[in-house]
Amino acid sequence: IPVVNKRITVSPIGTVCAGYSRDQMVKVCKLLDDCATDAGVDFLGGFGALVEKGITPGERNLIDALPEALATTNHVCSSINVGRTRTGINMDAVKLMGHRVLDVAAATADRDGLGCCKLVVFCNIPEDVPFMAGGYLGVGEADAVISVGVSGPGVVKKAIDRAVRRRGEQVSITEIAEII
């Protein structure tokens, strides 16, 4: 199965950089982007916050930094968790993220709103997410963890290629659906 994207995640930056200003959060995002480039990975996740029960000043600064941060970086992805079944939905966070999603889209309009492809707003985010764009290293994880994920598109492509080799070019759409 081909490796489609190489990804790394960090602990939620809203927690790690809790005392940072908006401008400092943008600088952190750019630093993370440089690290992703140096590491040779396609995506770096973790520029995010867990705000389901309230928003700290640092988390608010991170959220306010999202438009500039995602518009000026290539590899960094962000996830914001706004609710949990047990604790409810932080409606202030939902409202704030509604505005920030629009701001990110506007900030990356020259690239077809690409920033929004690097931003996920969750409810019930898992404790650790290795998949982009919502990836982050869970706070209960060890300092170095390897998660191996199977790429859905890579698996599908490999299965279709195998069927075409076996049956020739005459693979029907029904057969492809069955393979998938």
Describe these PLM feature segments.
Residues 1-180:
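Anaerobic metallocofactor- and corrinoid-dependent redox/one-carbon enzyme cores
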